[in-house]
A protein has these predicted regions:
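Residues on the lipid-exposed face of transmembrane beta-strands in outer-membrane beta-barrel proteins
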Residues: 2-6, 10-12, 98-102, 111, ...
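Aromatic- and glycine-enriched pocket-lining scaffold segments that form the walls
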Residues: 1-118
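Residues that define the transmembrane beta-barrel architecture of outer-membrane proteins
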Residues: 1, 92-96, 155-159, 197-203, ...
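Short loop/turn motifs that connect adjacent beta-strands in outer-membrane beta-barrel proteins
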Residues: 9-20, 30-34, 102-108, 166-173, ...
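Extracellular loop and loop/strand-boundary signature of outer-membrane beta-barrel proteins
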Residues: 82-86, 145-149, 188-200, 243-248, ...
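Transmembrane beta-strands of outer-membrane beta-barrel pores
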Residues: 8-10, 23-29, 104-106, 113-119, ...
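Outer-membrane beta-barrel "beta-signal"
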Residues: 2, 323-373
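Outer-membrane beta-barrel translocator domains and adjoining extracellular loop/strand segments
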Residues: 32-38, 81, 122-128, 186-193, ...
Length: 373
C-alpha cells in the first residue's frame, strides 16, 4: 500500500486544508464470514456458502422444491455454488482513494472518492453448465432462475463527504457523513440471474454531549453519544405475490439507531456504560451494559452482557418456486410470479432480519480479567 499527503495548511479561505491519496495494490482478500459454529459469524453466511458448495460438488436434497409439495434430490452440478471468482492480483484490480479535508471557521469537513473491490461476495446465477435432473440427457447449459451460482466480488465506486461542528449553546458536537456508491450487487428473485445492481445512498448523523446526571454522579459528566445510520437502495425492486414478497430482500430504506451512555467513578477507575442499538425495519434491538474496573495498575476487570429483543426471523421468497425446469417444476414459464408460494428464513430472510434480528437467541454474558506484567 502506498499513501501520500499534501498539507497546505492555512489558506486565504480555509483555516486548514490538506489532501491524501491512497493506492492499495495488495492482493485482494475477501472478508472472513466464518464457518458453521463460529461465534459472531454475521448472518451465518459461512454455513450457507459451505452447504451450497456441497450441493454443487456432491448433490443434496431441498425440501418443498417442485411445486411446494415434495422434497427433491439433486445430483451434483445442478444447484449450489459452482465457483468463486477472486479478482486477479494485477494493477487493474488495485484500489484507489482520494481525500480532501480541512477546517472552515470551526467546521471540519472532508470530501472523499474511492474505487475498490467489494470484500463481501455477490452470488450471480450465471452458471452455464448446469444439468436438468428431470431428463436423462446431460444438457450442461444455463437455466434462468436456477439457484446455481458463481461468486463474484464486484468493483464499487464511492463518493462521499463529512462535516463535524460544535454548537456551543448546547455544548454538543454533531457529525454528518454521507456516501453514494454504484456497482453494488444485491440478491433479486425477480431477475433471471437472481441478482441486480443498485446505487446506494448511505448517511450517518451523530451527536455527542457531556451531560451531568446529578442523581447518578454530581461531580463527573456522563458522555452521551447517539447516531442514526441510514441506507437507501436507489434501484430497489420488490413485488408481493401470493402473500409473499419477492425481489430484493434488503429494505429499500432502513435506519439503525445507536445510543451510548458512559460514566466514570472513583477517579475514573470504574467506568460503567450501556450501549443500545435498534434496527427500525427489522423491529430488533440489542442492549449491552458493561462495567470496567481498573483494580490496580496491573489488573483490570470487565463485566458485560448483551440482550437482544425483537420480532426474530423474517421470511422472504427464496426462489424454490421459481420453476427453472418446466414442466417438471411447475406449469408456465421460468420465473412466473404466479407460482411463487414459498418463502423462508434461510437464506434471504436473513437480510430482512439483519444481524440483530437474526441473533435473537444469542444473549451473552462476559467476564474478562486482564493482568499486565
Amino acid at each position: 500500500m502506498a499513501t501520500g499527503e499534501y498539507r497546505m495548511g492555512a489558506t486565504e479561505t480555509f483555516d486548514d486544508l490538506n489532501m491524501q491519496f491512497v493506492w492499495n495494490f495488495d492482493k485482494f482478500r475477501p472478508n472472513s464470514l466464518g464457518q458453521g459454529g463460529t461465534p459472531y459469524a454475521i448472518l451465518d453466511a459461512g454455513s450457507f456458502f459451505r452447504a451450497m458448495k456441497n450441493c454443487w460438488d456432491n448433490g443434496c436434497s431441498v425440501s418443498n422444491f417442485a411445486g411446494g409439495a415434495l422434497s427433491t434430490d439433486f445430483p451434483k452440478h445442478v444447484i449450489g455454488i459452482r465457483d468463486v471468482h477472486l479478482p486477479d492480483w494485477s494493477l487493474s484490480n488495485s484500489q484507489f482513494g482520494l481525500k480532501l479535508e480541512g477546517d472552515y471557521q470551526g467546521v471540519g469537513f472532508s470530501l472523499n472518492a474511492l474505487t475498490y473491490r467489494s470484500q463481501l461476495p455477490s452470488l450471480r446465477a450465471v452458471v452455464d453448465n448446469a444439468d436438468n435432473p428431470f431428463t436423462p440427457e446431460i444438457e450442461s447449459q444455463s437455466y434462468d432462475y436456477l439457484i446455481a451460482f458463481d461468486m463474484y466480488f464486484p468493483r464499487v465506486n464511492l463518493i462521499g463527504g463529512s462535516l463535524d461542528f460544535y454548537v456551543d449553546d448546547i455544548k454538543s458536537v454533531f457529525r454528518v457523513e454521507a456516501a453514494y456508491t454504484d456497482g453494488e450487487e444485491f440478491a433479486n428473485t425477480l431477475r433471471p440471474e437472481l441478482y441486480s445492481e443498485s446505487d446506494v445512498f448511505r448517511y450517518v448523523i451523530g451527536w455527542d454531549r457531556p451531560t451531568f446526571i446529578p442523581f447518578l454522579n454530581e461531580k463527573r459528566a456522563f458522555l452521551i453519544s447517539a447516531q442514526l445510520f441510514g441506507e437507501y437502495l436507489v434501484d430497489h425492486e420488490r413485488e408481493t405475490v401470493n402473500g409473499i414478497e419477492a425481489g430484493n430482500p434488503n429494505w429499500e430504506i432502513n435506519h439503525v439507531g445507536t445510543l451510548l451512555v458512559k460514566g466514570w467513578y472513583q477517579n475514573d477507575r470504574v467506568s460503567p456504560q450501556v450501549i443500545m442499538a435498534h434496527d427500525f425495519k427489522a423491529h430488533a434491538s440489542v442492549i449491552a451494559p458493561s462495567i470496567d474496573w481498573l483494580i490496580s495498575d496491573n489488573l483490570r476487570l470487565t463485566v458485560g452482557a448483551n440482550v437482544k429483543v425483537g420480532d426474530g426471523e423474517q421470511e422472504f421468497d427464496d426462489c424454490r418456486a421459481c420453476n427453472p425446469f418446466p414442466p417438471f417444476t411447475g406449469d408456465g414459464e421460468p420465473g412466473d410470479t404466479a407460482l411463487r408460494n414459498l418463502a423462508g428464513y434461510e437464506p434471504l430472510g436473513r437480510f430482512r432480519s439483519g444481524p440483530i434480528g437474526m441473533a435473537q437467541a444469542e444473549d451473552e454474558f462476559q467476564i474478562t480479567l486482564r493482568y499486565r506484567f
